[in-house]
Amino acid sequence: MLKAPRFWYQPRSLLGGILSPFSFLYQIIVRIRRGLYAVGLKKISKFPVSIVIVGNITVGGSGKTPFVIWLANELKNRGFRPGVVSRGYGGKANRFPQTVTENSDPLQVGDEAVLLMKKIDCPMVVCRDRGAAVKHLLRNFQCDVVIGDDGLQHYSLGRDLEIALLDDRHLGNGRCLPAGPLREPKSRLNTVDFVVPKQLRPNEIYQLKNPAKKIDFNELKELTVHAVAGIGNPGYFFKQLETLGANVIAHPFRDHYFYRSEDFNFDDDHLIILTEKDAIKCKQFDDERLFCFSVDAVVPDQFQNDFFRLISNIILRKQAQREGI
């Protein structure tokens, strides 16, 4: 995924205006595609367990990964048996569906999938075909709820609940691709079950070479650091470090970028701080300057109350249907 154009987040721009006819055409195609599923002309895969879709209507950077980590672990803590399916974006494996393990190679299954697997206590499967991923998951694991990571636009996968995440940039200029950042018209938010704002809380900063070595957040004050981010919204990461007091030298890379050691050949000895998703792909580098900035999702209490009330009822209903009650 390439860096988002600046004009996507400007109310008025010449380029946005020039591209607006293409956005109108894109919207028509999106509506037709969704309509074909709605009237049954395109097949929707349905399953006997609850399916919860987590996604967004904008391109990249809405905090899906930390949120899915929180959701999977919270479901497990409440006594449910969750599983996660994802596309495995950036992975180049020849065989799909594929179960992700802590030892999976990010080059094969994708960086987000490996990060998720390291931080959740439940099974995960990646496949471009989300329906095939769910089938594989249910065939090999006893799950009663499946989380579809970044699956809002994958209408071939049936769903019981939809959660749309919004980052600090909201909907940008409000236009669909290519004139704006929207994958679907903003009216799509009226059809999801929940809209949750992105909010991330700093957790810790640790050295990749020796994770026991950590940096206290107070040590960042007035410290000059190289901030490296190959994510959908690198600006959010840079701003977090600046808020903690660091003097940030920003190095944005394209989303899902795979690093080489020469990418860190800076002309000084300042610390290099990476996002968790980037750090997953840099553990092989023998460089004491590399540190990882980990974060946790902050989830509104009202959402938690409403969501778990709904999902509990859905899981119980589907369980009764499976048992013929």
From Swiss-Prot:
NCBIfam families: lpxK. Keywords: ATP-binding, Kinase, Lipid A biosynthesis, Lipid biosynthesis, Lipid metabolism, Nucleotide-binding, Transferase. It is an enzyme of class 2 (transferase). CDD domains: SIMIBI. Transfers the gamma-phosphate of ATP to the 4'-position of a tetraacyldisaccharide 1-phosphate intermediate (termed DS-1-P) to form tetraacyldisaccharide 1,4'-bis-phosphate (lipid IVA). It catalyses: a lipid A disaccharide + ATP = a lipid IVA + ADP + H(+). One of its GO terms (cellular component) is plasma membrane. One of its GO terms (biological process) is lipopolysaccharide core region biosynthetic process. InterPro entries: LpxK, P-loop_NTPase. One of its GO terms (molecular function) is tetraacyldisaccharide 4'-kinase activity. Its EC number is 2.7.1.130. This is Tetraacyldisaccharide 4'-kinase. ATP binds at residues 58-65. Pathway: Glycolipid biosynthesis; lipid IV(A) biosynthesis; lipid IV(A) from (3R)-3-hydroxytetradecanoyl-[acyl-carrier-protein] and UDP-N-acetyl-alpha-D-glucosamine: step 6/6. The gene is lpxK. Pfam families: LpxK (PF02606). Belongs to the LpxK family. PANTHER family: TETRAACYLDISACCHARIDE 4'-KINASE, TETRAACYLDISACCHARIDE 4'-KINASE, MITOCHONDRIAL-RELATED.
